[in-house]
A protein has these predicted regions:
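Functionally critical, mid-to-C-terminal surface segments that flank or help form catalytic/ligand
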Residues: 171-178, 188
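Catalytic nucleophile-His microenvironment captured as a short glycine-rich beta-strand/loop
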Residues: 10, 178-181
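A charged helix-plus-loop insertion that forms the helical arch/lid used to bind
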Residues: 97
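Short secondary-structure junctions
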Residues: 32-34, 184-187
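Secondary-structure boundary elements
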Residues: 78-82, 88, 100-168, 176, ...
Length: 188
């Protein structure tokens, strides 16, 4: 088990019109993540609405802030338990057998345009042994073909941008690997 302590403090100055917020700062409720303690402080007398996504356990807090200062403080102690498998024994699951809850992770997204990487993914990795070794080959390929360079991307940088520019930061490496996996129908 791994224990993590989170402490978040956000400070805002709200104009005379007030403001609506949606925060994603709460620790998620999942089978492998137990929240042993948590505390939320709002400097304004606000009754927030907290929604838990039934699929992934992520929690969102919505609130309407009044004019003036707003301080949001959240702290939590979270205990994580992970399932470990021997990577060599992790099979690749055909699309027809994928659990419904992971189907969304094979589709293209704003940052992971897997539909634009189909030809590259299939020509480079399509003939490889399916399963962990194929995912590991994708990781190695990205590591060989993309250079880590601080400040080389921004919030609009996508997997295709990273592939073209061949530079990026951690997030960009992840987006390119995710897009290549999705292009091969490997949920990521």
């Amino acid at each position: 088990m791994i224990r993590i302590q989170l402490n978040i403090e956000l400070n805002y100055e709200i104009d005379q019109f007030g403001a609506d917020f949606v925060f994603n700062i709460h620790a998620a409720h999942t089978a492998s993540q137990q929240i042993s303690s948590e505390n939320l402080f709002l400097s304004q007398a606000i009754d927030p609405q907290i929604y838990t996504d039934p699929v992934n356990g992520n929690r969102y807090m919505r609130l309407r802030a009044w004019p003036g200062p707003l301080k949001v403080q959240y702290s939590a102690t979270v205990d994580l338990t992970h399932h470990f498998s021997n990577p060599a024994q992790v099979p690749e699951v055909p699309v027809r057998n994928l659990p419904p809850e992971v189907m969304g992770y094979i589709y293209p997204s704003r940052y992971c345009q897997s539909d634009r990487l189909l030809k590259l993914a299939n020509s480079t990795f399509g003939g490889q042994w399916q399963g962990y070794s194929r995912v590991e080959a994708i990781r190695e390929w990205v590591q060989r073909h993309v250079t880590f360079t601080s400040n080389s991307s921004n919030t609009n940088t996508s997997a295709v941008d990273t592939l073209i520019e061949r530079v990026g930061i951690c997030r960009d490496f992840a987006h390119l690997m995710i897009a290549l996996c999705r292009a091969l129908n490997i949920p990521a």
